[in-house]
Structure formats: C-alpha cells, structure tokens
C-alpha cells in the first residue's frame, strides 16, 4: 500500500497512519529489492531436490535414503537437514512395520533338513546363501501366492514366481529362475527357508540335488530364523502392495513383477548394503573382485 501511494503521501505520513516504523518499512523494501538471502535460496533449492527424490520413490523414501540420493548427486548435506526439509514440506517416508511370521504348513512325515545358516544370511559373497519364502497377496478375485528367492549377500531377488496355489511347483519355478539367472554354480549354495511342506518335500529335495543346492530350514514358529526373507515381505507389502487395491489377479501379477525388477532390485536403496540398490551392489562386488 505504501508503495502504491508514495507519489501522493510522504513515507513518514503513511507509516504513521499505518502504525508501522519507517525503519521497518525500509528494511522490508531492501529485502524485497535484493531478493531472497543466500540461506533462503539454498533452502528453497534443497527443498525442491528433496521433493523430487521423494516423488521418484513413490513417496517411500525418508531422510536416510534421500540423503544417499543427494550425496550421489554431489550434494554436501546432513541427514538432519534433509529431515528438516521433509518436515517443512509436509513429506514423510514409509517405514516397514515389524514383520509378522507368515503361515507355514509343515509336513509331519517329511525329513527336515538342519539349520545350516544360524541367522547368518550374509557371508560376504554372492551365491553362498539364498533365502526363500512364500507370502499371500490379496486381490478382488481371490488370493495369489508369491514365492521369492533372494541372495543373502546382495539382497537381490534372483527368482520369483506367482500362482493361485501354494504348492512345491511354485517354489521350484522361483528356484528355476534363480538358477537360470546365476548360471552354473561352481560351489554348493545353501537354500534357507522355513519348515513349510514345500521346502521339506521330496520333490524339492530332488530339484536341489540336481542344481547344487543344499537345503536348510529354521526352527518351527521362529520367524527370526528366516528374518531376511520376512523383511522382504515387509518392504513389498508396506512400500508397495498394500497401498493399492487389486481388482484382478492378472494386474497384481504384472505389477508385483515390475516392482521387484524395476524398483526393488534396481532402484531401492538398502541400508544393509551401503545405501545401494542390490544390482549396483553386485556390480561393485564384481568390479572389486576383477580388480583384485
């Protein structure tokens, strides 16, 4: 208002009428003419970048993973600063809930393998321990069952299969994908799972023997003995699957496969592997081995 009427009234008179100080008015005008301060400009720039990375993660990433994205782009910033930016913008990441053990149907007549892992899923090398499990996926057309196989070192999903029935063929299909991806295995690989009848079956025992896999299972009703596989389900359900409604089984199958390969394996940063994606982590391991 003062700016609009300064040709008619003196600045002093208008400040008196509006009950504002002249020093305050001149301070405001200098700030407007000089533009935002370097601090405010830097904050606005950071907020924009944080918002872009948050959106790119489908609203999943919080401060730790966005910090990794920023630093990968050359930004020198702290986790505390990133967290403050998220708060200013009303943004938040999604943290997986504590996982709950999935229902396991055991076979009382099966010969149960020993636990060869002892919760040490990551031995520091690829193709030493594979973990596997089965989970339920709800759709409007009924249930689907997803079996996944992950490398214990890189956390990469190397095999997966989805079907309407939870039988041994489902597990075998996921393992067949893993074997095809990894190629001929020079050493025996431990395949660790729970005591579900699919994993203790004679059918799977034959498949494992034919493909240089040695079976290992955890204790009954102790979900921590297969914690790495269970943590994958928590990420899948909380960060992706449970955020949407699935009208058809076909749509769910396509979307889950896309999320596993495009997001989880190639984009999602994992705190356990230096905030890298599983594929990038495997690439680094390969480069390190070749340089040695």
Give the predicted meaning of each segment.
Residues 1-292:
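Charged DNA-binding/catalytic regions of mobile-element recombinases
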């Amino acid at each position: 208002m003062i700016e609009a009427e300064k040709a008619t009234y003196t600045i002093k008179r208008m400040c008196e009428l509006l009950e504002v100080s002249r020093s305050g008015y001149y301070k405001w005008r200098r700030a407007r003419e000089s533009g935002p301060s370097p601090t405010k400009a830097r904050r606005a720039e950071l907020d924009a970048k944080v918002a872009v990375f948050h959106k790119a993660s489908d609203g999943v990433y919080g401060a730790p993973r966005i910090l990794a994205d920023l630093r990968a782009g050359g930004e020198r910033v702290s986790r505390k600063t990133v967290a403050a930016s998220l708060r200013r913008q009303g943004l938040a990441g999604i943290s997986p809930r504590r996982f709950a053990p999935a229902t396991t149907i055991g076979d009382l007549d099966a010969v149960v393998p020993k636990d060869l892992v002892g919760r040490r899923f990551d031995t520091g090398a690829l193709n030493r321990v594979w973990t596997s499990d089965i989970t339920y996926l709800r759709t409007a057309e009924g249930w689907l069952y997803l079996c996944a196989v992950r490398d214990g070192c890189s956390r990469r999903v190397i095999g997966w299969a989805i079907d309407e029935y939870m039988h041994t063929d489902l597990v075998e299909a996921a393992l067949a994908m893993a074997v095809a991806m990894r190629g001929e295995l020079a050493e025996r690989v431990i395949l660790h799972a729970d005591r579900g009848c699919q994993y203790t079956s004679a059918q799977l025992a034959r498949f494992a023997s034919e493909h240089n896999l040695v079976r290992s299972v955890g204790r009954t009703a102790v979900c921590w003995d297969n914690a790495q596989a269970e943590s994958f389900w928590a990420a899948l359900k909380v960060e992706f699957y449970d955020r949407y409604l699935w009208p058809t089984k076909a749509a769910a199958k396509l979307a889950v496969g896309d999320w596993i390969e495009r997001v989880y394996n190639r984009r999602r940063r994992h705190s356990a592997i230096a905030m890298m994606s599983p594929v990038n982590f495997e690439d680094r391991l390969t480069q390190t081995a070749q340089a040695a």
